[in-house]
From Swiss-Prot:
The keyword Nucleus does not apply. GO terms for biological process: programmed cell death; proton transmembrane transport. Keywords: Hydrogen ion transport, Ion transport, Membrane, Necrosis, Transmembrane, Transmembrane helix, Transport. GO terms for cellular component: membrane; vacuolar proton-transporting V-type ATPase, V0 domain. CDD domains: ATP-synt_Vo_c_ATP6C_rpt1, ATP-synt_Vo_c_ATP6C_rpt2. Gene3D superfamilies: lithium bound rotor ring of v- atpase (1.20.120.610). SUPFAM superfamilies: F1F0 ATP synthase subunit C. This is V-type proton ATPase 16 kDa proteolipid subunit c 3. Expressed ubiquitously. Higher levels of vha-2 are found in adult H-shaped excretory cell and rectum. Higher levels of vha-3 are found in gastrointestinal and hypodermal cells, as well as H-shaped excretory cell. Pfam families: ATP-synt_C. The keyword Transmembrane applies. Residues 37-58, 120-137 are cytoplasmic.
């Protein structure tokens, strides 16, 4: 029986960190998406009392918040596909890289969801009183959405390298 030093030093708990990365990507982006959806929906509901004709036009922040959750789903599925057992060669370096990828995507999505919720709420209420604010609201929402997209791009680079 021979002793293989590389196999002996491979941590059996390395896949745990990979799966934690996949889970954190999904959990944190969905938390951000839920907050953005709820906060924007509160603004839409209070605006709909005064100007019900603007409700469909004001759904954009809710849609953009939902897209943040999809970013986390994509990264979680990519990371889940990369995690193997420790005996198949999955080491701590890969586990920590996948954890970093998941946290990057998740926390960027959480921040983007918060930003979309706050901007969506204030923007929808403001648009009800001054329709010219709509374009500015959309631009700020796009910049907020891009924060989550940046996190997904970095996570995919970290997760596949």
């Amino acid at each position: 029986m021979s002793y293989d030093l590389e196999t002996a030093e491979r941590a059996a708990y390395a896949p745990f960190f990979g799966y934690m990365g996949a889970a954190s990507a999904q959990i944190f982006t969905v938390l951000g998406a839920a907050y953005g959806t709820a906060k924007s929906a509160v603004g839409i509901c209070s605006m709909g009392v005064m100007r019900p004709e603007l409700i469909m036009k004001s759904v954009i922040p809710v849609i953009m918040a939902g897209i943040i959750g999809i970013y986390g789903l994509v990264v979680a599925m990519v990371l889940k596909g990369k995690v193997t057992s420790a005996s198949a060669g999955y080491d701590l370096n890969k586990g920590f890289a996948h954890l970093a990828a998941g946290l990057t995507c998740g926390l960027c999505g959480l921040g983007a969801g918060y930003a979309i919720g706050i901007v969506g709420d204030a923007g929808v209420r403001g648009t009800a009183q001054q329709p010219r604010l709509f374009v500015g609201m959309i631009l700020i929402l796009i910049f907020s959405e891009v924060l989550g997209l940046y996190g997904m791009i970095v996570a995919l680079i970290l997760g596949t390298s």
